[in-house]
Amino acid sequence: IDKNKNFLDVFFSDTIETSLQHENPVIIMAGGFGKRLMPLTKNCPKPLLPVLGKPVIEHIINKLKSEGFKNIFISTHYLSSMIREYFGNGKNFGVTINYIEEKKPLGTAGCLSNFKSNNDKDFIVCNGDVLTDISFSHLLDYHSRNKSIATMAVREYFWKHPFGVIKTNGLKIKSIKEKPIEKTYINAGIYVFKNRITKILKKDKKIEMPDFFRLLKKRKY
């Protein structure tokens, strides 16, 4: 951003590649219909929409590559042929790309039931429309150090009430706060999982990511 607050560029350190190479698979979720961005997504899948001359998903792949993640899987459904045609096997982008094709929409976690890893490493999942400066390496390290089954990246979100908020005790007013600001945490659309957790998913059954986390917690997997 320049001194006049004009947006100039997004920098993801694409040109600064680490010497450390990670074998961990990364699944990029790119199968959604992008309904909220219609009509832009009528003839183009949302992950291929350009930001500063490159598709959103290409920014993600470049960020991953710069951190040494080159074992990439892309989950596709809507207009999947366009994504396959653009990236191919990933050779032109300096990575290896395999595809997980959803024959029907499986939600934000259902495609993991069709994921066949090419190693036994923990894997990262990232939504295909996320522009982020998060360190995937640090997230993976955090996940490993805590010996977690599943890790979700979150971000702080501040929300201002549009009205005065009243707290009561029965019919008595305890306090009044005029349009207070509350801090919460929201899902950032990036996760790390133990490789074996995909076994609890039923093949080709639709499931959303929040429900998947509830399932993991319930089973204490």
Predicted regions and their residues:
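Short beta->alpha transition motifs characteristic of CBS
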Residues: D2, N6-L20
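Catalytic-core segments of class I nucleotidyltransferases/pyrophosphorylases
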Residues: F123-I124, L131, S137-S144, Y157-W159, ...
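Conserved N-terminal catalytic core of the sugar/cofactor nucleotidyltransferase
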Residues: K3, K54-N127, H138, K203-D204
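A conserved hydrophobic position in a structured secondary element of the catalytic/binding core
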Residues: F11, Y78, C126, T168, ...
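Active-site metal-binding loops of divalent metal-dependent hydrolases
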Residues: F33, G128-V130
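A short, conserved acidic/glycine-rich loop-to-beta-strand motif
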Residues: N146-E156
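A structural signal for short hydrophobic beta-strand segments in well-ordered beta-sheet cores
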Residues: L48, V165-T168, F213
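N-terminal glycine-rich phosphate-binding loop and ensuing alpha1 helix
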Residues: T18-S81
